[in-house]
Amino acid sequence: MKMRTKLIIVAGMIIPCPCLADLIPKSHIGIAGIDFQSQVGLDYGHENNVTYQADDQDAVSADFQSVRPMIKAIGARYQDQYLLMYSGDYRRYNGDPADNYTDHFFRFNGAWRYGQMHGLTLSLDDSLGHEVRGRGITEGFRPQQFSDFGIHSPLSTTLFNSELRYSYGALKGRGKADVALLFRKLRIGRTADIKNTDIDFYNYILGQEWHENGLIAELSDQYSLATRFRYRFMSNQRRYEIDSQKDNDEYYLEYGIKSQLTDKTRVDANASWLYKTFNNNPNSRDFSGVNWDIQAEWQPLKQSVFTVHTSQRIKDPSEIGGYIMVSKYGIAYQHFWLVDRFSTTFDYSYLTDSYKNYPNDRKDRNRVFTFAMNYNFRPSINVELKYQLNTLHSNQDSDSFFIGPGGDRQVVRTLGHDNSLIMFTAKVQI
């Protein structure tokens, strides 16, 4: 397998996000006092490995353009608050139309207060996204495999997320108690060509769909103006629509702290003990261990910010059995120039995916380097140039999974990739 790192001036991987940042909102007050705000982001860039191929000879290199609009409506009635939001991401590749995509994100938030001590919030999100060819379900697929399985465009994903939360405590009080019920659902679409080409792989894709019920019980303590503690219990029950052997239950006990330790140092840390069970798979092993998400920030000078971050979590694989332990470590430095209007950022992250309870003991190592230059031309206009280099190496040259009624058809994934892209972004608050 040919793996070579190319140093190409790049402007950053696009990470789907439901909002645009770094701009001061412009309010347009309409009927009934509703506050309308809108933004648009315009991207232009070049990506050297659109489908994350391991072999340079298979890599597709293409220029692209993106339009990312966002609009939201904010309303209030006494202490009650409401939010409606839409954002989109419309990307087109020159010379590679097969990987074009259109994403949509919808959100509703409602917050109601009943007296001084009681609150109720409802959050509904619907994310109509996509899965890049060569990532996720099609990770490690070569161009011939895309053709063999009828994958002529990115798979579409629909992730619905809802939360109903009750809070007890004064709005500006020291502490509060929350109880929340959650429901999430994942569906995968744009599979008609796959169904007509290979029914076994089509059924494999359907096996990745799931729904999940969750419960959160949480206590928050605003210990001081600078420090807040949080204690949380979480339970998730994920059920796969077809492949019940992948069903699992998760139970978390979490402790969190967010504190301004000194004038120059801040920390935001969450640590949890996780117990994960696979009740329908006799060959699986339950997991118990520690997850964490920690970020510390040090600002020795007004114009300089150092950040270190680390996290560990457990995620489900595409196949039956086992789990993936995802660990991340990173460091970043941001410097502000020209009275904070211009900034430069260096960020390096090292990620590992360790496949547990797997026969080949697979371990992937992913290194991501990012350099960004950001300029606030006006409070409502921001421009940015990013460079990012994303390389993944594995201790295995390939991995495989099996499809078909008897699970006897082997599908091989070729592991590793070298991806870089350059992107210029302009964001405008309308």
Functional labels for PLM-detected ranges:
Residues 414-430:
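Outer-membrane beta-barrel "beta-signal"
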